[in-house]
């Protein structure tokens, strides 16, 4: 296996109200707010990582990975959000000739996935990077074109399991929320040093929080805030009681917003999707699973542009050579089936979209590719 590189005690937060299950698109890849509300997740207790929509991902990507050989020889799959390596393990097991490149910014995730995927030897290359570092990762691994990309967005169960990371509002922990533990900015930095107007903007834009201004005012008045428990208590005071009784846990939007801001998640995604599309070979496929509306809008917009004709508007016929470079493999966004949700409740919020590259400009070979 190749390794590359780029650049408090658990405690239940005290809420006098019950924590209802979310009815809208909660933001979690592997442990949703619905799981938390149902008691399916206990801080400090490791959970089995059940890959979301695993069979559907295999169904969509395998044709691209077996175009040359039925065992995947000559094909490269990039798992841009490696996490615990659940999806990666399935593809490597099914296709004994496949080479997989796994990306993750979290060194703990790379360690866990590396141990899990070690039996596959040099068929696996792991790169520590955000998923917008695709071009550099491919250059480091000597790959010019990719047969398939898989993106499984959001926060992982491992990150939620580790209380000290500060991602969960169900346990008291330091206000951290960094996916890369070496990154300089933490959630505590945001709430304790940013101007009130900037905190308001973050909560409104990244959390779609309608009480953003009220919350920001309370934060500035009460800071410094150092733990998730302190922030949860503040949110209970800041959000009006009627609003706390509907729409899920009152902290979910603020925690989502801070996490997105700390990790630059949306900017990274906006750069990553075009980079992935540009690296696909003809016949290659990309699958993206999003778990909250902000991510899904970005994916939807990028995919719509990729599947649009390049013929100038107003012409009555399609110009030769101007056909769309990509075709959609899904009709809009696919959802998990009731059976899938029954087996894996974490799949309830997922929106899956997929494309295949069918024509157009060839992928530009990278100078560093061997």
Swiss-Prot record:
It comes from the Bacteria. It catalyses: cytidine(1402) in 16S rRNA + S-adenosyl-L-methionine = N(4)-methylcytidine(1402) in 16S rRNA + S-adenosyl-L-homocysteine + H(+). It is found in: Cytoplasm. Residues 333-345, 353-370 have a biased composition (Basic and acidic residues). Keywords: Cytoplasm, Methyltransferase, rRNA processing, S-adenosyl-L-methionine, Transferase. It is an enzyme of class 2 (transferase). One of its GO terms (molecular function) is rRNA (cytosine-N4-)-methyltransferase activity. Residues 333-370 are annotated as: Disordered. InterPro entries: RsmH (IPR002903), SAM-dep_MeTrfase_MraW_recog (IPR023397), SAM-dependent_MTases_sf (IPR029063). It holds the Pfam family Methyltransf_5. GO terms for cellular component: cytoplasm. S-adenosyl-L-methionine binds at residues 85-87, 104, 131, 152, 159. Its main location: cytoplasm. GO terms for biological process: rRNA base methylation. Its EC number is 2.1.1.199. Belongs to the methyltransferase superfamily. RsmH family. Specifically methylates the N4 position of cytidine in position 1402 (C1402) of 16S rRNA. HAMAP family: 16SrRNA_methyltr_H. This is Ribosomal RNA small subunit methyltransferase H.
């Amino acid at each position: 296996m190749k390794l590359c590189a780029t650049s408090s005690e658990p405690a239940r937060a005290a809420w006098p109200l019950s924590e209802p299950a979310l009815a809208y698109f909660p933001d979690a890849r592997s442990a949703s707010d619905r799981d938390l509300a149902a008691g399916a997740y206990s801080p400090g207790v490791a959970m089995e990582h059940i890959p979301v929509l695993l069979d559907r991902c295999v169904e969509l990507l395998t044709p691209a990975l077996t175009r040359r050989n039925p065992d995947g020889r000559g094909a490269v799959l990039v798992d841009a959000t490696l996490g615990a390596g659940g999806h990666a393990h399935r593809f490597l097991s099914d296709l004994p000739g496949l080479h997989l490149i796994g990306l993750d910014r979290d060194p703990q995730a790379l360690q866990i996935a590396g141990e899990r995927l070690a039996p596959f030897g040099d068929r696996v290359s792991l790169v520590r990077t955000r998923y917008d570092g695709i071009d550099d990762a491919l250059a480091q691994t000597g790959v010019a074109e990719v047969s398939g990309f898989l993106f499984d967005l959001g926060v992982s169960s491992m990150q939620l399991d580790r209380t000290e990371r500060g991602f969960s509002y169900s346990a008291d922990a330091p206000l951290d929320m960094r996916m890369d533990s070496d990154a300089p900015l933490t959630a505590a930095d945001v709430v304790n040093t940013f101007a009130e107007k900037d905190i308001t903007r973050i909560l409104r834009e990244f959390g779609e929080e309608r009480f953003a201004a009220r919350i920001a005012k309370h934060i500035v008045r009460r800071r410094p805030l150092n733990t998730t428990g302190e922030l949860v208590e503040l949110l209970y005071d800041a959000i009006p009681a009627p609003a706390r009784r509907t729409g899920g846990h009152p902290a979910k939007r603020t925690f989502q917003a801070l996490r997105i801001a700390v990790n630059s998640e949306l900017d990274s995604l906006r750069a990553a999707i075009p980079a992935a599309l540009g690296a696909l070979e003809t016949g290659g496929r990309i699958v993206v699973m999003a778990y909250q509306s902000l991510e899904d809008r970005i994916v939807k917009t990028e995919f719509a542009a990729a599947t649009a004709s390049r013929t100038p508007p107003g012409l009555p016929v399609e110009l030769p050579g101007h056909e769309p470079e990509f075709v959609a493999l899904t009709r809009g966004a696919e959802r998990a089936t009731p059976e899938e949700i029954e087996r894996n409740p974490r799949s309830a919020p997922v929106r899956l979209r997929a494309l295949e590259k069918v024509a157009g400009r060839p992928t530009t070979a990278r100078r560093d590719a061997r």
